[in-house]
Amino acid sequence: MDRVAFTLFGIDIMWYGILMACGMILGTLIAIKEAKRVGIKEDDVLNIAIIAIPVGLICARIYYVVFNWSYYAQNMSQIFNFRGGGLAIHGGLIGGILAGYIYTKIKNINFLKMADTVILGMPLAQAIGRWGNFINGEAHGGATNLPWGIMVDGVKVHPTFLYESIWDFGIFIVLLLFRKNKKYEGQVIVTYITLYSIGRFFIEGLRTDSLMLGPLRMAQVISLIGVIGGIIAHVYLSKKNKNNISEE
């Protein structure tokens, strides 16, 4: 499939970028709508999006380049070439969450409440963005005989982009359904991190283009940390909420 959607003023506009932009815009609109429901200023959500999205993209690229340094050390000019892909979601999440945290501290806003609001549309944005990997012919798995395998370079392989897209969409539905009944501030983002990490850990094991640190697949390492951290955060925040209720 052609990676180029169309050409504008002599510049090729890539499907990868279009799908990512659509996901980000939709995710931001969902967050703004959720902000109205929970009493958060829409301007603050928009400001966080304006800050966190570019910071997240830069961090996603840095993460990808660092763990592909053997290639980029020989091709320095490609470090700033975003158009062909090469963004790591874990780097983007870390950068985006950190940017949002700093903003809430400066503005004296409840970080966990804001995080629950902003993260709601994130898995849907990811589900859409993963189709950019399909168009680029990347982020696929190894050979398979399963009927839903896709052909890449004459070999039928696991469509891991599809597995993750479906998983991400499922997470979005889960968050959408239970957010109104959450037990504590931060439960939505903790649930997102935990569920995404579980799915990514297993899906990553099928991929053939994993970012490596020695013998370790970095996405699996980060995902394992995400699961453990999510469980610890859930226990801590649940206990903290119960203590606050008791004191009241």
From Swiss-Prot:
Q: Which InterPro entries match?
A: Lgt
MF term (GO), any: phosphatidylglycerol-prolipoprotein diacylglyceryl transferase activity
Which UniProt keywords are given for this protein, alphabetically ordered? Cell membrane, Membrane, Transferase, Transmembrane, Transmembrane helix
What membrane topology does this protein have? Multi-pass membrane protein
The residues listed in the UniProt record as binding a 1,2-diacyl-sn-glycero-3-phospho-(1'-sn-glycerol), with positions renumbered to this chain, are R130
PANTHER family attached to this UniProt entry: PHOSPHATIDYLGLYCEROL--PROLIPOPROTEIN DIACYLGLYCERYL TRANSFERASE, PROLIPOPROTEIN DIACYLGLYCERYL TRANSFERASE
> What protein family does this chain belong to?
Belongs to the Lgt family.
Its recorded name reads Phosphatidylglycerol--prolipoprotein diacylglyceryl transferase
Q: Which organism is it from?
A: Clostridioides difficile (strain 630)
